Design a protein with these regions (language model features):
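Metal-coordinating catalytic core of metallo-dependent amide/deamination hydrolases
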Residues: 1-89
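Short, acidic/turn-prone active-site loops that include or flank metal/cofactor-
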Residues: 53, 110-114, 139-141
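Catalytic beta/alpha-barrel core
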Residues: 83-92, 109-113
Length: 218
């Protein structure tokens, strides 16, 4: 009820907006997820949950529910509403198929996943399946910092190793995921890009230092 009150108070087009954040499938019951899905639809907002973060989570779901977490949440209808799946390291082709064409956005937190040895998210495969990828940091306790520039660089480099393809997740795609992709994940259609009519949320980057060289845009 408190969450819904905040949504009704703040979700009026301002800079601060709220959604629902059920932690993860292994801490939230089907009944609670169903209530949250109904509330998100009624209040036209998003749902944010950690998903397929560890192998244990997937194994436990198979034991408790007889299906993988993505399949369970797909059955409940989570991905039919605006949703965000955080981490997504322990996934297979069936999981990707369950998400493809749905309203789910992927929040990739590579440095947190590395620190916790949780696994590697195949973000190029997810991107190829039509899913919106965006960059996150998780929390400082599992990351050491909340540096989005560092996180984006790590995402771009790690994706190449995971895909075994030097052309996977190139710099422009990584930058899009850190900006426009993130805006879309939170339903902010007028953010994340320099366009007429968009909100002018920008930073200036000094490219004169040696550590920014060479500057090359093919």
């Amino acid at each position: 009820a408190k969450n819904t009150d905040l949504i009704k108070e703040f979700n009026k087009g301002g800079d601060i907006q709220f959604g629902y954040g059920p932690h993860a499938p292994y801490t939230v019951s089907d009944a609670t997820f169903e209530k949250i899905i109904d509330q998100a639809q009624a209040n036209n907002t998003w749902i944010h949950t950690h998903l397929h973060e560890t192998a244990f989570e997937v194994q436990q779901s198979m034991t408790d529910f007889g299906m993988r977490p993505v399949a369970r949440l797909a059955k409940l209808g989570l991905f039919d509403v605006h949703s965000q799946a955080v981490h997504m390291t322990q996934i297979n082709d069936e999981d990707i198929e369950n998400l493809s064409g749905k309203k789910c956005h992927i929040i990739h937190c590579p440095e947190s996943n590395l620190k916790l040895a949780s696994g590697f998210s195949p973000i190029q495969k997810l991107y190829n399946a039509g899913l919106n990828i965006n960059i996150g940091t998780d929390g400082a306790a599992s990351n050491n910092d909340l540096d989005m520039v560092s996180e984006t660089r790590t995402a771009a480099l790690l994706a190449k190793a995971v895909a075994e393809d030097a052309e996977a997740f190139p710099a422009y795609q990584a930058m899009y995921s850190a900006t426009r992709g993130g805006a879309l994940a939170f339903g902010r259609d007028k953010m994340g890009s320099i366009q007429t009519g968009f909100e002018a949320d920008m930073i200036a980057v000094n490219l004169d230092d040696l550590n920014t060289q060479p500057v090359f845009d093919p």
